[in-house]
Curated annotation (Swiss-Prot):
Name recorded for this polypeptide: Ribulose bisphosphate carboxylase large chain
Name of the gene encoding the protein in the UniProt record: rbcL
Keyword Chloroplast: yes
Site (Transition state stabilizer): K325
Catalytic activity: 2 (2R)-3-phosphoglycerate + 2 H(+) = D-ribulose 1,5-bisphosphate + CO2 + H2O; D-ribulose 1,5-bisphosphate + O2 = 2-phosphoglycolate + (2R)-3-phosphoglycerate + 2 H(+)
Cofactor: Mg(2+)
Top class in the EC scheme: lyase
Extra remark beyond the main annotation: The basic functional RuBisCO is composed of a large chain homodimer in a 'head-to-tail' conformation. In form I RuBisCO this homodimer is arranged in a barrel-like tetramer with the small subunits forming a tetrameric 'cap' on each end of the 'barrel'.
Length: 441
C-alpha cells in the first residue's frame, strides 16, 4: 500500500505545536494575522509556520526523505489582539538550520518571502524577530558602530548634526559643493546627499564627489572640526556602487551612504564589508520603507527592517522622528531606536518589542532623526533621543532667511544650549522654549 493519503491536509496537524518549548538557537517571529472569515486562528498560524519553512499544501513523497520534525517551523503560541476583532499574534519558531549564515537576504526570503500572499489570510504583518546570538554571530554587522565613529570624528557627549542638501535635484556639482561648504562652516557635523541623488544628467556622481570633497576639506580647515558628507554610492549595479565607494575612499572623505531597501540587502552587506575594510563610515537611508511598513495590519514593521539592517551593516540609519506624533508612537519609535543602538533590549510590549533581544557584542547604529524638524524641536529631540543620535534638519537649516551658514549656526547653538541645560539638570520638556530663546540672543 501507499505510505500516506493524497489530498489537502490541515496544516495544524503538523505545524501548530502549543506544547513546544523554544530553543535558544531558534529564530522567533511574531506575526499579526488577520485570517479570512471562517479560518480558525490555529490553522492560520500553522499555515504561516508551514509556508515560511518546510510545508506545502499537501504531503509529498519526498517528505519521507527528511526529518520534518527537525526542520519545520512551529506555531507555538497564538494570542488575540486586544481591541481588534479577528486579529491574532502568532508566534513561530524556526530551527536555525533553515538559514544560510551571514545572509540577511536568505533570512528574509525564508521568513517573509512567500507567505504574505497566502489565501487563508486577509492580511499578515511581521511585527518582530528574535535573532539568537548563534545566528547574529555569523554577521559582522555595522562597519564601525557608535563608539568607533565618535573616536574617528572626535565628537563626544552630544548628538551629531546633519542636513540634507536641497533642492535635492537640479543643482550643478559646483553649486552643490558650495551649499555643503556653507552648512559645514556654520557648525554642522554632516551634510547628506538626498536618497534620490545617484548620478543623473544634471550632476554626475564623480563631479559631485570631487566638489563635495573640496567643501569638506575647506570647512575642516576653517573650523578645526572633522566634517563629513554622506556621499550616496547607491547605483544600478553592485560593481558600480563599489566603484563609487572606492573613489570616495581615494578622495579621503569619511563617510558614504546607501539606500538599503531599494539597493537590496545583498548589495548593502557587500558595501558594509568594503567600508569596514577601508575605514569608511556608512550612512543608511530607508527609501521604500513605507511601502513595507506603513499598514498596521500588513507588511513588516520597521523594527524588523531595523534589526535586519543592524545585521547587514550600517553606522547610521534614518529612523523618522518622534516630535509632534502621538505618545504611543513615541514609545514604539524609542523601542526600535534602542534595538539599533543597545546591546540588550528587554521584551516590552508597550514599546512594540515582542522578544528580548541580545546582540552580544554587535556594534550599534546611530539612529538619524529627520523629517520636518527644526530648531524649536531641539529640546524634545535631545531629551528623547539622547546623545547617541544624529539630528538632521533639511529645510530647518537651509530655510533660514539669511542662508545656509546662519541656519547651521542656529542649529549648532541650539543643540549646545540644550545639552548644557540638560547637563545642568534643567527640565528640557518644561523649559525648552525658554532655553532656545536665551540661546538665540
Amino acid at each position: 500500500g501507499v505510505g500516506f493519503k493524497a489530498g489537502v491536509k490541515d496544516y495544524r496537524l503538523t505545524y501548530y505545536t502549543p506544547e513546544y518549548n523554544t530553543k535558544e538557537t531558534d529564530i522567533l517571529a511574531a506575526f499579526r494575522m488577520t485570517p479570512q472569515p471562517g479560518v480558525p486562528a490555529e490553522e492560520a498560524g500553522a499555515a504561516v509556520a508551514a509556508e515560511s519553512s518546510t510545508g506545502t499544501w499537501t504531503t509529498v513523497w519526498t517528505d519521507g526523505l527528511t526529518s520534518l520534525d527537525r526542520y519545520k517551523g512551529r506555531c507555538y503560541d497564538i494570542e488575540p489582539v486586544a481591541g481588534e476583532e479577528n486579529q491574532y499574534i502568532a508566534y513561530v519558531a524556526y530551527p536555525l538550520d533553515l538559514f544560510e549564515e551571514g545572509s540577511v537576504t536568505n533570512m528574509l526570503t525564508s521568513i517573509v518571502g512567500n507567505v504574505f500572499g497566502f489565501k487563508a489570510l486577509r492580511a499578515l504583518x511581521x511585527e518582530d524577530l528574535r535573532i539568537p546570538p548563534a545566528y547574529s554571530k555569523t554577521f559582522l554587522g555595522p562597519p564601525h558602530g557608535i563608539q568607533v565613529e565618535r573616536d574617528k570624528l572626535n565628537k563626544y557627549g552630544r548628538p551629531l548634526l546633519g542636513c540634507t542638501i536641497k533642492p535635492k535635484l537640479g543643482l550643478s556639482a559646483k553649486n552643490y559643493g558650495r551649499a555643503v561648504y556653507e552648512c559645514l562652516r556654520g557648525g554642522l557635523d554632516f551634510t547628506k546627499d538626498d536618497e534620490n541623488v545617484n548620478s543623473q544628467p544634471f550632476m554626475r556622481w564623480r563631479d559631485r564627489f570631487l566638489f563635495v570633497a573640496e567643501a569638506l576639506f575647506k570647512s575642516q580647515a576653517e573650523t578645526g572640526e572633522i566634517k563629513g558628507h554622506y556621499l550616496n554610492a547607491t547605483a544600478g549595479t553592485c560593481e558600480e556602487m563599489l566603484k563609487r565607494a572606492v573613489f570616495a575612499r581615494e578622495l579621503g572623505v569619511p563617510i558614504v551612504m546607501h539606500d538599503y531597501l531599494t539597493g537590496g540587502f545583498t548589495a548593502n552587506t557587500s558595501l558594509a564589508f568594503y567600508c569596514r575594510d577601508n575605514g569608511l563610515l556608512l550612512d543608511i537611508h530607508r527609501a521604500m520603507h513605507a511601502v513595507i511598513d506603513r499598514q498596521r495590519n500588513h507588511g513588516m514593521h520597521f523594527r524588523v527592517l531595523a534589526k535586519a539592517l543592524r545585521m547587514s551593516g550600517g553606522d547610521h540609519i534614518h529612523a523618522g522622528t518622534v516630535v509632534g506624533k502621538l505618545e504611543g508612537e513615541r514609545e514604539v519609535t524609542l523601542g526600535f531606536v534602542d534595538l539599533l543602538r543597545d546591546d540588550y533590549i528587554e521584551k516590552d510590549r508597550s514599546r512594540g518589542i515582542y522578544f528580548t533581544q541580545d546582540w552580544v557584542s554587535m556594534p550599534g547604529v546611530f539612529p538619524v532623526a529627520s523629517g520636518g524638524i527644526h530648531v524649536w524641536h531641539m529640546p524634545a529631540l535631545t531629551e528623547i533621543f539622547g546623545d547617541d543620535s544624529v539630528l538632521q534638519f533639511g529645510g530647518g537649516t537651509l530655510g533660514h532667511p539669511w542662508g545656509n551658514a546662519p541656519g547651521a549656526v542656529a542649529n549648532r547653538v541650539a543643540l549646545e544650549a540644550c545639552v548644557q541645560a540638560r547637563n545642568e539638570g534643567r527640565d528640557l520638556a518644561r523649559e525648552g522654549n525658554e532655553i532656545i530663546r536665551e540661546a538665540s540672543k
